[in-house]
């Protein structure tokens, strides 16, 4: 099977790269093993929240300039501030065109409220998510009886420290009892599958309506809206106060929705989606990828003009830690890591951990190297890249988006030259 590009990995980076390549008229396939890290995320995307020295970032342009001085090998630093901002804006446009209506400004971070009621700097958020400063003084944090993925009293306690009048309440929906037989089934995603049925909407409205008359804003867990935000908008039009949603413990409704919106758009535009499959071997000839062998297509290789590695980091098995060191399991690419295992981590758990910055070695075009030699038609994007800490620096989503579009532009340019 011949393709212009085969992308190994169906997470945020892989999907955005595929969508951008489709804009250039290239035929793409995505090989994906299972759920991506988006299923376990908040659904919000960070661009740059903090510098390596711990300094928080609000002005993104100034933050990118400072980042280049502190971390010259960071993926952003390799591109330059203006290029990062341009690609981030393009990514935001691409997300919105795919149906993921995320709001934010590439120049200025905003503060979203987290499930614990604290604030986190971010780039893009769903319209349901409450953003600081809140537009209300009287707030009620509402939990769902029996839902362990969200603790209303913890969020309320944090918000009260910000001089807000915050109460808590709990709604009990007997219609959800079918899920209570097994506590592991009473999760936000399973609740959403029931509540998203239009016939159930009035039940949720009836439960929230008495609470809404006594406050200016309701904050509740995101336990509906797997496909879109229609129910949230329907409730907001009818309730006498604003309704906002907080992501829950994983799996996350908002994260799954974002992934599904991008995946559906990729398929609608003619992309080949290969779920439940896994790349087992990649054949390289003369420094280029010539064939990609997958588990489900055992004796039928995929033959791409270009290949993209978007396999993620340790969480997605894009990187594997062994006693002897860190390795990239698909091609055995060169990996940036510390010399000894003892240097992988810091003693204090909440300190920035060196292993977070491990990843494949690439040139400035994000082409990785194998035994010191650049693989000419292979690009690495997203969390598999080296040189950044997605947790401490708050840049995971941004690196995925920016590197994906940068690689897509490179491929499109080279594909045009080869025609």
Curated annotation (Swiss-Prot):
Pathways involved: Polyol metabolism; glycerol degradation via glycerol kinase pathway; glycerone phosphate from sn-glycerol 3-phosphate (anaerobic route): step 1/1
Cofactor(s) named in the record: FMN
Keyword Nucleotide-binding found: no
SUPFAM superfamilies, A to Z: FAD/NAD(P)-binding domain
Entry GO MF terms: glycerol-3-phosphate dehydrogenase (quinone) activity
A GO cellular component annotation in the UniProt record: glycerol-3-phosphate dehydrogenase (FAD) complex
Pfam families hit by this protein: FAD_binding_2
Superkingdom of this protein's organism: Bacteria
UniProt keywords, alphabetically: Flavoprotein, FMN, Oxidoreductase
Catalysed conversion reaction: a quinone + sn-glycerol 3-phosphate = dihydroxyacetone phosphate + a quinol
EC number: 1.1.5.3
Repressor found in the keyword field: no
Role: Conversion of glycerol 3-phosphate to dihydroxyacetone. Uses fumarate or nitrate as electron acceptor.
The protein's assembly and partners: Composed of a catalytic GlpA/B dimer and of membrane bound GlpC.
Annotated protein name in UniProt: Anaerobic glycerol-3-phosphate dehydrogenase subunit B
Protein species of origin: Salmonella paratyphi B (strain ATCC BAA-1250 / SPB7)
